[in-house]
């Protein structure tokens, strides 16, 4: 390992590659805003987030909390008692109750691991109850809260000094939560040249700052906030914002280059979003430029209206588009009238058919609201299986709440990744505990590919609360076989991780004999008696190669096998916000003002409106390219929510 001045390390097998591929842009990092340097509206907003800073404030910290005996909301106070963080409840009914909490906010972990920017990396605490740095849903100030277990569910509660008490459900299955929380393959050290140095606190200094700990596995770039729909669940709509945000081609190229300049792991996957990205006047030119700049995966977050046109889809494919992240809330128009206010199913079907014609992949993206369309989870899975030749995955997105909502309604409509695991298990025959895993579970797979190739490969060291799901093998008779049923994944990934670290330490690429050992590990942990009868080990290996190598292809011939990803990506909002999650975010936004984690840009502190206004244009009040049957529909009446697409 080569150690930099801040104790973060670059694996030796990547040193040569990094020397041969210096960044193109030479951006100088900006300083974190202070009382003396604050000038803009955004600057003062950043400062306001720090005004109750728990680390600066210290203990004791007064709040309200749910009594562990009677469940009433009572006065409480976090105190330091004999080097232990303790929440002291003052319950009128049950008296004074003390409850110790796991903590690394006031009791820093002694590990000496730092980011490339020199900031200490605090380990994830899987134990409960624990302290958490979170946000006030009303004002976005960073405040102290706690994760705790009640009636088999995991909850977060907090009290803002200005706006009072809030509580939200994190996961309705504590066993599912605990399994995810304990899975870890070590920490990543972030990016080598962060755009903000000497950050004071997360998330007040986003852009990315030197506290950030993860690379980007997928970067979003908003081409426009204009749209040919007016969905009530969208956070990026010019008709609501009152202005147009639409970067120029030159600005977009610079934003793309900033992603390619990520080190030590360049960003290779970009998603153009909006608004509706397909209505940008330079859409095809932008997609083509991304291909020429070396992005190996180019996708769009789209409602499918433009892509339903065959000629438009053909031009998009020829420009270099690989995948559609297709807004897909259900399998009939009754659902779309609820969530989008428009009958859209025919556009979804036409879009998928065009992707089938031109060989593009589709990932279905449903926004799931408990009690509204969670009955569609199984139906969407069935639809994906019926279209497995084109649909490669489903990214279920539990809704994020950006508007005000009382706790009763929040609980009624909050859909968690634990809910999703159980709904998918019922629909597929999978086990909600054994067969589902967090996104960071795949880190060893990326590590071993990197040492084989001798070059950086994207990794997913995100927080286990951010996303979880499973891959399925899909047999010709459309039966689903979860990967963990066919593979003993836990011991196999553990061995792959140890082998990758050994090769990194030795500073060399994998030899022929190393590759044989890797193949043996896959063979050793393969369970053919649990697999589809026609899934041979050779087809299995070729299928895994096809998931990371376009030359092999995904289920494209008799040598490979169809696979389907079914996962939940639970973006945060101010009610369930956890600063530890943000520091490990792997879904980023590239903007003219720098790069932001998804949940700080959209649905936590929400930097989006500040950035967009800085580059806004005069609003053309009428959305463009709206088909007549859609344009005349009335918008749905739902609460203010957010979704990606």
Model-predicted regions and their roles:
Residues 6, 12-33, 357-559, 642:
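Radical SAM enzyme [4Fe-4S]-AdoMet core and its adjacent flexible, acidic
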Residues 6-58, 104-127, 177-202, 206:
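Short, intrinsically disordered terminal segments enriched in charged and Pro/Gly residues
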Residues 43-55, 69-77, 116-123, 139-145, ...:
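Short Cys/His-rich Zn2+-coordinating modules
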Residues 54-62, 79-84, 123-131, 148-153, ...:
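Short, flexible, mixed-charge glycine/proline-rich loop motifs
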Residues 67-70, 91, 136-139, 160, ...:
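Short cysteine-rich clusters marking metal-coordination/redox-active sites
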Residues 90-98, 102, 148, 152-177, ...:
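Conserved alpha-helical substructure of the radical SAM core
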Residues 252-271, 280-398:
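Radical SAM/AdoMet-radical enzyme domain recognition
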Residues 541-644:
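C-terminal target-recognition/interaction regions appended to catalytic cores
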């Amino acid at each position: 390992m080569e150690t930099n001045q801040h104790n973060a390390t670059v694996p030796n097998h990547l040193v040569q590659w990094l020397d041969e591929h210096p960044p193109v842009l030479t951006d100088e990092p900006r300083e974190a805003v202070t009382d003396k340097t604050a000038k803009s509206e955004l600057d003062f907003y950043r400062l306001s987030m720090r005004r109750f800073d728990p680390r600066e404030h210290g203990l004791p910290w007064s709040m309200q909390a749910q009594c562990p005996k009677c469940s009433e909301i009572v006065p409480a106070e976090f105190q330091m008692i004999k080097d232990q963080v303790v929440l002291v409840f003052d319950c009128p009914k049950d008296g004074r109750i003390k409850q110790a909490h796991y903590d690394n906010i006031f009791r820093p972990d002694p590990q000496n691991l730092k980011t490339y920017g020199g900031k200490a990396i605090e380990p994830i605490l899987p134990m409960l109850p624990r302290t958490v740095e979170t946000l006030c849903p009303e004002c976005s100030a960073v405040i102290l809260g706690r994760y705790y277990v009640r009636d088999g569910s995991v909850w977060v509660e907090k009290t803002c000094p200005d706006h009072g008490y809030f509580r939200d459900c994190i996961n309705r299955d504590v066993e599912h939560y605990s399994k995810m929380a304990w899975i870890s393959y070590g920490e990543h050290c972030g990016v080598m040249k962060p755009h903000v140095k000497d950050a004071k606190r997360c998330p007040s200094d986003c852009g990315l700052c030197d506290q950030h700990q993860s690379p980007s596995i997928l970067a979003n770039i908003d081409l426009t906030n204009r749209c040919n729909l007016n969905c009530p669940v969208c956070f990026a709509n010019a008709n609501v914002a009152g202005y147009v945000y639409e970067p120029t081609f030159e600005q977009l190229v610079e934003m793309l280059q900033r992603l390619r300049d990520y080190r030590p792991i360049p960003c290779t996957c970009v998603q153009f979003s909006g608004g509706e990205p397909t209505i940008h006047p330079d859409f095809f030119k932008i997609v083509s430029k991304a291909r020429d700049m070396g992005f190996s995966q180019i996708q769009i977050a789209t409602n499918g209206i433009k892509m339903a046109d065959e000629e438009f889809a053909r031009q998009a494919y020829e420009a270099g588009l690989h995948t559609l992240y297709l807004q897909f809330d259900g399998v009939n128009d009754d659902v779309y009238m609820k969530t989008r206010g428009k009958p859209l199913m025919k556009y979804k079907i036409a879009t998928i058919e065009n992707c089938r014609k031109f060989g593009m992949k589709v990932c279905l993206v449903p926004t799931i609201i408990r009690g509204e369309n969670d009955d569609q989870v199984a139906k969407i899975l069935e639809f994906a299986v019926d279209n497995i030749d084109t649909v490669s995955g489903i990214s279920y997105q539990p809704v994020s709440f950006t508007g005000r909502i009382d706790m009763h309604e929040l609980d009624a409509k909050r859909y968690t990744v634990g809910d999703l695991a159980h709904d998918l298990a019922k629909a597929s025959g999978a086990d909600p505990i054994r067969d589902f895993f967090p996104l960071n579970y795949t880190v060893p797979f990326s590590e071993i590919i990197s040492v084989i190739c001798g070059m950086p490969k994207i990794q997913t060291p995100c927080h286990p609360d951010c996303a979880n799901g499973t891959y399925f093998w899909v047999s010709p008779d459309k039966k689903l076989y979860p990967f963990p049923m066919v593979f003993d994944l836990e011991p196999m990934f553990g061995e792959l991780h140890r082998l990758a670290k050994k090769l990194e330490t030795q500073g060399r690429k994998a030899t022929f004999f190393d590759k044989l050992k890797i193949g043996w590990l896959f063979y050793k942990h393969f369970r053919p008696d649990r697999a589809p009868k026609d899934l041979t080990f050779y087809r299995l290996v070729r299928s895994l190669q096809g998931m990371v190598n376009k030359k092999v292809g995904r289920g494209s011939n008799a040598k490979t096998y169809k696979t389907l990803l079914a996962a939940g990506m639970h973006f945060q909002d101010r009610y369930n916000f956890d600063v530890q999650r943000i520091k490990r975010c792997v879904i980023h936004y590239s903007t003219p003002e720098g790069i932001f984690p998804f949940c700080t840009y959209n649905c936590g502190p929400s930097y989006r409106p500040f950035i967009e206004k800085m580059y806004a244009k005069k609003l053309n009040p009428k959305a463009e390219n709206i088909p007549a049957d859609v344009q005349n529909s009335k918008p749905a009446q739902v609460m203010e929510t957010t979704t990606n697409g």
